[in-house]
């Protein structure tokens, strides 16, 4: 924001010339103290890291920070070697933590009986557990785990946020989500989460913010039929018509009317996982999910009653690549999926 920076520079020069009040407290003519004072007033905003850097030094600093972020992520790849928390077995009624994934797009997929299904690709990028909160410090019912997804640049993050991630030994994340868990599903902060946390054949719930459509009428927003195009109709073709009766003398709350459409959080329940790619951490879920491409979505085990008992066959509390389990193949498929390399026609 060059306008804000120019205004701050002018204000610093004016305050630096003052001989009493704030200018005397900070030292007359001392612009460095003035800048520190102004930055202290805006501690929640991004840092001006490139203020005293030349154009040649900016790429060097960015590369240096990028290498440091990669080293921090590599140090967290083996959480079981660094004094892990005790791992408890699965019990009926247990709730695991979820993931934060990036929506890549959609593609077709075929089953062995020839049916075509459209799936959405969700990629897990640098997803880590950030904080554990016991149920005594939460709502008294369930514990929570804070999970961060997708590493972002630290140059535009506030100092207080950077301090939180520095204590964890992780680079800052783009978004943080909270998941309710049971006590036996607690995971140590700093543990990475992978797409193998889920398995093909299970069902998940996906939450994301829908695409904003702006202010829309009732035909687009609610699917109203509209009114006749001819036969004396004037300027009412796409209008809702009557919104109430004359007896009540008011409009009932919740009546479908024009308004802002989209840009709200929605959840798709009971989406089947058809395929898992362990190399690129991609989850193939059935159907569409809310949000645009490259948006971050929240994925967790389905809470529908029909799928609650499927958790006993899943990695609990999560998948550890350095655990006792055998190494997973690059692709995991549901038993009904026709694999890309399999023949399309077979003869009995």
From Swiss-Prot:
Places the protein is found: Mitochondrion
SUPFAM superfamilies assigned to the protein according to its UniProt record, in alphabetical order: Translation proteins (SSF50447)
Annotated GO biological process: mitochondrial translation; translation
Main location: mitochondrion
Transmembrane segments annotated in the record for this chain: none
Targeting signal (transit peptide) range: 1-40
Pfam family, one: Ribosomal_L3
UniProt keywords, alphabetically: Disease variant, Mitochondrion, Primary mitochondrial disease, Ribonucleoprotein, Ribosomal protein, Transit peptide
GO molecular function term, any single one: RNA binding
InterPro entries: Ribosomal_uL3, Ribosomal_uL3_bac/org-type, Ribosomal_uL3_CS, Transl_B-barrel_sf
GO CC field: mitochondrial inner membrane; mitochondrial large ribosomal subunit; mitochondrion
Assembly notes: Component of the mitochondrial large ribosomal subunit (mt-LSU). Mature mammalian 55S mitochondrial ribosomes consist of a small (28S) and a large (39S) subunit. The 28S small subunit contains a 12S ribosomal RNA (12S mt-rRNA) and 30 different proteins. The 39S large subunit contains a 16S rRNA (16S mt-rRNA), a copy of mitochondrial valine transfer RNA (mt-tRNA(Val)), which plays an integral structural role, and 52 different proteins.
Disease per record: Combined oxidative phosphorylation deficiency 9: A mitochondrial disease characterized by failure to thrive, poor feeding, hypertrophic cardiomyopathy, hepatomegaly, and psychomotor retardation. Death in infancy has been observed in some cases.
PANTHER family: 50S RIBOSOMAL PROTEIN L3, LARGE RIBOSOMAL SUBUNIT PROTEIN UL3M
Sequence similarity: Belongs to the universal ribosomal protein uL3 family.
NCBIfam families with a match to the protein in the record: L3_bact
Protein name: Large ribosomal subunit protein uL3m
Organism annotation: Homo sapiens (Human)
């Amino acid at each position: 924001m060059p306008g804000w920076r120019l205004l701050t520079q002018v204000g610093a020069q004016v305050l630096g010339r003052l001989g009493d009040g704030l200018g005397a407290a900070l030292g007359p003519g001392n612009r460095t103290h003035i800048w520190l004072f102004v930055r202290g007033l805006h501690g929640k905003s991004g840092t001006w890291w490139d203020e005293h850097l030349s154009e040649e030094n900016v790429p060097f600093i960015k590369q240096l920070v990028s290498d440091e972020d990669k080293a921090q992520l590599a140090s967290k790849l083996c959480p079981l070697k660094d004094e892990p928390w005790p791992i408890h077995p699965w019990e009926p009624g247990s709730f695991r933590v979820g993931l934060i994934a990036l929506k890549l797009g959609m593609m077709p997929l075929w089953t062995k009986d020839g049916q075509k299904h459209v799936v959405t690709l969700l990629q897990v990028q640098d997803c880590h557990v950030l904080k554990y909160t016991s149920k005594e410090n939460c709502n008294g019912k369930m514990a929570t785990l804070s999970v961060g997804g997708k590493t972002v640049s630290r140059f535009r993050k506030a100092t207080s946020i950077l301090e939180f991630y520095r204590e964890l030994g992780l680079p800052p994340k783009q978004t943080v989500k909270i998941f309710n868990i049971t006590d036996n599903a607690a995971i140590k902060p700093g543990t990475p989460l992978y797409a193998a946390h889920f398995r093909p054949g299970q069902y998940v719930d996906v939450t994301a913010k829908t695409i904003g459509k702006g202010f829309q009428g009732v035909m687009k927003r609610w699917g109203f039929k509209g009114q006749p195009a001819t036969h004396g109709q004037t300027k009412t073709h796409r209008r809702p018509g009557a919104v109430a009766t004359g007896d009540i003398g008011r409009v009932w709350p919740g009546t479908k009317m024009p308004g802002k459409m989209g840009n709200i959080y929605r959840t798709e329940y009971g989406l089947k996982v058809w395929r898992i790619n362990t190399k690129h951490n991609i989850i193939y879920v059935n159907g569409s999910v809310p949000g645009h491409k490259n948006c971050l979505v929240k994925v967790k085990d389905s809470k529908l009653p029909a799928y609650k008992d499927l958790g006993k066959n899943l990695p609990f509390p999560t998948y550890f690549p350095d655990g006792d389990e055998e190494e997973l193949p690059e692709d995991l498929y549901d038993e009904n999926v026709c694999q890309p390399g399999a023949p399309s026609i077979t003869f009995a």
